[in-house]
Amino acid sequence: GRRYFAMTQPNVRAVCQDGRFFLQKTDRRYDVIAVDAYRPPYIPFHLATVEFFQLARAHLTDEGVIAINVGRTHDDYRLVDALAATLAQVFPSVYIIDEPDPGYGLGNSLVVGTVQTTRLENLRVNSTTLTHPLLVEMMQRVLPQVRIARPSPGTPIFTDDRAPIEQVV
């Protein structure tokens, strides 16, 4: 995983286990929590609820972000929107970064929640200060795809007591 995802920096800690169980057992705080467990139709509902996102937020630093990778079809954003709406119950700013459709009808979106209230314009301004070539290249690709999450009224919000994911995927 480290080599495939280019996670060779010494300060990156990859945890390959149930994220909720791990967070319940640790006191550590992180700058970034990345979750990659949402490939339809096999969604672990306990990693998609308000309560899970509250637990994750408690383990983020004051400047922290949570980033969740969500599989989707090229035109069905129901799961992306539901996860964004659920994330917005816990995080003041939520963004969606859509990966361009690779041409076979499936794609991914990255849903990002920030502990601090942020503005999309701040991301654009801050990206101009980057010097690492990999980060500069990534931001050039990502910035045009970033949008503020604005789920429609009535979009489901998942909780431990009610997470009808199978109705969304």
Give the role of each language-model region:
Residues 1, 19, 34, 64, ...:
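Residue-identity detector for glycine
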Residues 28, 36, 90-96, 139-140:
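Short amphipathic alpha-helical surface micro-motifs
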